[in-house]
Every structure is written in structure tokens, then in C-alpha cells.
Amino acid sequence: EFARHVEAVTARTLTGEPLAVEKSRKNRWRVSTGGADRIVVSYLVYAREMSVRTNWIEADFAILNGAPTFLTLADGDIARPHDVTLELPTGWSLSLTGLAPQTDRGPHAYRAADFDTLVDSPIVAGNPAVCEFVVDGTPHLLVNLGESGVWHGPQSAQDVEKITREIYRMWGVMPYDRYLFLNMITEAGGGLE
């Protein structure tokens, strides 16, 4: 029921002319495009529920999950690429996700091959602790938010690298170009692979 977190939906043409938007169902909006084949849709998303399926944004960092964040066309055209560009607040330097970087479009621009990839690729932004290791030429990043003495990042990265090497030894292949382990370390516990 992610639509309850979406509000203030607006639309405009590429030249900035406003377009009419109406909420047609609790999880759908209809835009009168005026014949435009490309438009810009903007909206606000509630982001103060920390779980493995929702979003959390605070002064120091953001965790964005795709399903409660991104809208797409209702006609089922989910196989097309989806682009995401983040504008980070002053003082934030990193955005990290499994999405393909599009550095020609900016330091925080990404592309998902399709909507399923988009909603299955969480994004972390801020200044998290990042430890990197390489297995069989494939970079792996261990991204830790909230580490502050509870979790020793470099030692954790060494431990995760050992596990990853064993998995590679067993399967003989790395079925990805890059892998991110995203850890939000809180007193609440929990987790999701």
C-alpha cells in the first residue's frame, strides 16, 4: 500500500507548462498530456518509516527502496529503461545502488534496465562508511550506515570477502558486474537479503 506515501503529484511539459493531474484510484494518477510524448512528473514521498520495504530520510543519510519511491506508466510498459538522478543535500557526497551508473549524466545518475530492476535496487545516500574488495575482478562494496562503534567496518569487509570468495569457489562465476552489501545498523535488528 505504498500509494498512501505519495502526495502532491504534479506534471509539466519539457518546456515547463503545467499539465492537469487527477487521482483516478488510490494508487493511480491520470495526466492530461495535451499530446506531449514526454512529460515530467514530480511528487513527494513520505520517508520516515524505517523498514526493509519503506524509505527513511534524515539529516545525515537516506535509504530509498524502489517500490515505495518510483512511479511508472500504468499501461504495463515496464520493460523500458528507467533513469534516476539524485540531487544530494549540501554535505552529502555519496549515493550507492546496484543500478548502473550513468556518469555522463552526473555523479548521482543511474539507469535501470527495466522497472523490476529499479524497484529491486535500494539506494543509499549521504556519507556512509564504505569498504571495498574485489573477487575475480568483480568489485564488492560493503556500505555501513550507523556503524559508530557497534560494527567494525574493515573487519566486517574482510569477513564478507571470505564468504564471497567461498561462494565464488563453489559456483565458479560472479553473475554480476558489481555487488553492494547495504547495511543499516540499528538497535532494532532485522535484515533482508
Indicate where each model-derived feature is located.
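Acidic/histidine-enriched alpha-helical segments
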Residues: 178-186
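Catalytic zinc-binding patch centered on the HExxH motif and its immediate surroundings
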Residues: 187-193
